[in-house]
Amino acid sequence: MDLDFVRGLRQAELDLALTEIASRKPTGSSIVEIGGGGGWQAGMLTEAGFRVRSFDLAGSQFSAHRTFPIEDYDGHRIPAADASFDIAFSSNVLEHIPHVRSFQAELHRVLKPDGIAVHLLPTASWRVWTLAAHYPWLVKAGAEAFRATRGGRRSDDAHVVARAVQRRSRTQLVSRILLSPRHGEAGNAVSEIWHFSRHRWTPLFEETGWRVVSRGTNGLFYTGYSVLGWQLSLTARRRLSHLLGASCHVYVLEKASASRANSASAPPAAVTVQAKAAQ
């Protein structure tokens, strides 16, 4: 995995998320980040003037690359008091939480009554194109692994292939080669096309006490394999997203209870108009 490329994508996505956050919450607001990874985005949020606490599992994929004081937690209970934060933020994380539905209650707990949640989540398009990219990635990784046996430098992709060969039985290895693995915690690589669609994410949020304030995309095209990496610029990836679909949803949520409270406190305009008409 090209960490510089991943970091560049996350920077571009966070710029978009920051626009959503800044339009709703002032600088200096408190943020809880779930799945902080290497801490890149937590650092960027801090530089933008927000107060950030970022949490992740101790054995997360990017734990060896942390650039921010990520706090370890058990994946269930956020070590923070009730109503501690103005904003909950995650980037490509919720799909990796097996108990994603019940975890929404924990996000509700640590958010203030008027808090918002901003989540970046993979799309159905990302899943489709990641399935398609599996085989070009295998060719690339296999070629790099072969060059490594001839004394060349072994790339990250070649390391993935080598580990797959070492750790799997023949049946598992054939399956891993022929089929793209699932990315998240629900279904398989094919059914994730539905699991990652808005038809699954939107009801999940609405059924767990949220109101969807807005839903957009990151406006970028990429796959889970990053076969071309920086050979495709961000500008090219933005253009491709219009043709092939964007890779991430951007959801902005508020507590449904807060939405109801705001509605209840608003003046009953329609009733007032009717009353005047009756007079």
Locations of regions flagged by a protein language model:
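Conserved N-terminal segment of class I S-adenosyl-L-methionine
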Residues: 1-81, 87-89, 104, 220, ...
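Helix-to-beta-strand junctions that scaffold the AdoMet/dcAdoMet cofactor pocket
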Residues: 97-98, 111-113
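Active-site micro-motifs of SAM-dependent methyltransferase domains
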Residues: 77, 95, 124-126
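Conserved aromatic-histidine-acidic binding/catalytic patches
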Residues: 5, 9, 33, 37, ...
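A short SAM/SAH-binding and catalytic strip from SAM-dependent methyltransferases
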Residues: 87-98
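S-adenosyl-L-methionine-dependent methyltransferase catalytic module, highlighting the catalytic core
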Residues: 101-102, 106, 116-252, 256-258
